[in-house]
């Protein structure tokens, strides 16, 4: 496909954008949040569950599928869409971030990256050309280049080297990409340096990719730094191409990202916290394990109309989590994905009506975000845990 994006409107008082992402499996209204299905499934949900909450785009991960069941198996099954019985849009990550997360288990050179599988310890080597070939065999609608994501404490020289390697790999990925029905997105790196972020954005923009992602952010740095970097970087990317902020999914962060001019988001957060008993609501996250929910007859979120809130009391959900029943994780996940899907629909409508800033302000007046210092500590612990495994 030649055209990847239609920009319909930009807010007159911010950089919020309303558009459509054009793919071989349909049109996606933007701004959009994509649930993550790393291993060809959004954990605990069926494709029908996703459609019921108006999700038509998900992310899957090439790294996981490469290791298990293997790219040839998925290709033999007719590609990723048929393999998982999903007729919506699929974005595949190249696996660069997952390999980065392996820390001591991987080694980089100019040709590619070698790493030890977190499953069986076997040594693998992936080149940029391999990453493209794998994603073409998967048949995703949007593929990502292989990039190097420097760790959050990397030196300036290390960040520069990672950026330059990412640029060279991006050129190789672009040269190797031949599947016309698939869009290949570049990934901007550069750490938290405004100078390097500008250099990366300008260089990748000169290569004329169908879309651009911002990588290497939301890795434990303060949120104000994250979005300062996002705003700065987007100034140097083309307005007529989609912008994708990787790894961001908290409600307050989605609103801030939209106000910066981001079109696409993904994150494991809503599904991961759901399995830990955290339910999104207009007031903030609610911990269903708290004793206050043990006898609550009404739904956990009275303002929500999802399947979970229509059919089950907070007391029942509290009981399921206390007993560690599998149904608990499924019902919580349905709710959190529905919450974000509805939130993004409201965002799109508010941009159309020129009242996004009021909507954002009203939402954040009521919503209580997670404590920032606690959030950073939790993020660092999660990243450390991922050094030896990559499950989402």
Swiss-Prot record:
Pathway: tRNA modification; tRNA-queuosine biosynthesis. Substrate binds at residues 93-97, 147, 189, 216. It holds the Pfam family TGT. Binds 1 zinc ion per subunit. Residues 247-253, 271-275 are annotated as: RNA binding. It catalyses: 7-aminomethyl-7-carbaguanine + guanosine(34) in tRNA = 7-aminomethyl-7-carbaguanosine(34) in tRNA + guanine. The keyword tRNA processing applies. InterPro entries: ArchSynthase1/Queuine_TRR, TGT, TGT-like_sf, tRNA_ribo_trans-like. Gene3D superfamilies: Queuine tRNA-ribosyltransferase-like. Its EC number is 2.4.2.29. This is Queuine tRNA-ribosyltransferase.
């Amino acid at each position: 496909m030649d055209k990847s994006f239609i920009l319909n409107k930009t807010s007159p008082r911010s950089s919020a954008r309303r558009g459509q992402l054009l793919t071989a499996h349909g049109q996606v209204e933007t701004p959009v949040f994509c649930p993550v299905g790393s291993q060809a499934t959004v954990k605990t949900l069926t494709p029908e569950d996703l459609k019921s909450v108006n999700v038509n785009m998900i992310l899957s991960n090439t790294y996981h599928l490469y290791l298990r069941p293997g790219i040839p198996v998925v290709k033999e099954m007719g590609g990723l869409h048929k393999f998982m019985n999903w007729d919506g849009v699929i974005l595949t990550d190249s696996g660069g971030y997952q390999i980065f997360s392996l820390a001591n288990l991987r080694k980089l050179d100019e040709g590619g990256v070698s790493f030890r599988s977190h499953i069986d310890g076997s040594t693998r080597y992936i080149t940029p050309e391999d990453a493209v070939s794998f994603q073409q065999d998967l048949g995703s609608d949007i593929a990502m280049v292989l990039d190097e994501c420097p760790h959050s404490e990397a030196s300036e020289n290390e960040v520069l080297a990672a950026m330059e390697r990412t640029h060279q790999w991006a050129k190789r990925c672009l040269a190797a990409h031949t599947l016309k029905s698939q869009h290949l997105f570049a990934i901007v790196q550069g750490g938290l340096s405004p100078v390097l972020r500008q250099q990366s954005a300008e260089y990748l923009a000169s290569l004329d990719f169908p879309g651009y992602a911002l990588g290497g952010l939301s890795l434990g740095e303060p949120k104000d730094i994250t979005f300062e970097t996002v705003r700065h970087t987007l100034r140097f990317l083309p307005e007529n191409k989609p912008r994708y902020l990787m790894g961001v999914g908290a409600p307050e962060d989605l609103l801030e990202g939209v106000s910066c001019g981001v079109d696409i988001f993904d994150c494991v957060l809503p599904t991961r916290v759901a399995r830990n008993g955290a339910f999104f609501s207009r007031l903030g996250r609610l911990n269903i394990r708290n004793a206050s929910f043990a006898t609550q007859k009404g739904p956990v979120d009275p303002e929500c109309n999802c399947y979970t809130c229509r059919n089950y009391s907070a007391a029942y959900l509290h009981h399921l989590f206390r007993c560690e029943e599998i149904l608990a994780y499924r019902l919580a996940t349905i709710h959190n994905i529905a919450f974000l899907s509805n939130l993004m629909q409201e965002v799109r409508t508010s941009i159309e009506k020129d009242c996004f800033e009021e909507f954002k302000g009203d939402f954040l007046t009521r919503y209580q975000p997670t404590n920032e210092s606690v959030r950073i500590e939790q993020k660092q612990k999660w990243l450390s845990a991922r050094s030896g495994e990559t499950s989402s």
